[in-house]
From Swiss-Prot:
Protein name stated in the entry: Large ribosomal subunit protein uL24
Record GO biological process: translation
Organism: Methanocorpusculum labreanum (strain ATCC 43576 / DSM 4855 / Z)
CDD domains according to UniProt: KOW_RPL26
HAMAP family: Ribosomal_uL24_A
PANTHER family linked to this entry: 60S RIBOSOMAL PROTEIN L26 FAMILY MEMBER
Length: 121
């Protein structure tokens, strides 16, 4: 059965808000660096903890760090080195959107993930 899609922004926001967890994984894809793109023949791949990423947009642009965590529910990524100061001086991690970061080095500890990388689209 084909999924019916709408071009209305309110329905797109509603779809993302109400999406089940297994569908939200698709929202967590980030573009691959050019060397990884050539090696694996893929433009983007899902971000996991342990990947090395580079921030492409925002006030933290240019910072490169390891992914500390992935929030599937809110579709955000936590990167080591990307912090904001609270009023009391405490550093808290700043969640980033996966579309605003680029994967520069993949975490290849998971055999299933490596096998998925090798599959040509």
């Amino acid at each position: 059965m084909a999924r019916i899609s709408s071009t209305q922004p309110r329905k797109q926001r509603k779809f993302r808000y109400n999406a089940p967890i297994h569908t939200r994984g698709a929202f967590l894809h980030s573009p691959l660096a050019s060397d990884l793109r050539e090696k694996y023949g893929k433009r983007s791949f899902r971000v996991v903890t342990g990947d090395t990423v580079k921030v492409l947009r925002g006030e933290f642009k240019g910072i490169e760090g390891v992914v500390d965590g992935v929030d599937v529910k809110n579709t955000k990524v936590l990167v080591h080195g990307v912090y904001v100061k609270k009023a009391n001086g405490e550093d808290v991690p700043r969640p980033l959107d996966p579309s605003k970061i680029m994967i520069t080095k993949l975490n290849t500890k998971d055999a299933v993930r490596v096998a998925r990388l090798e599959v040509k689209a």
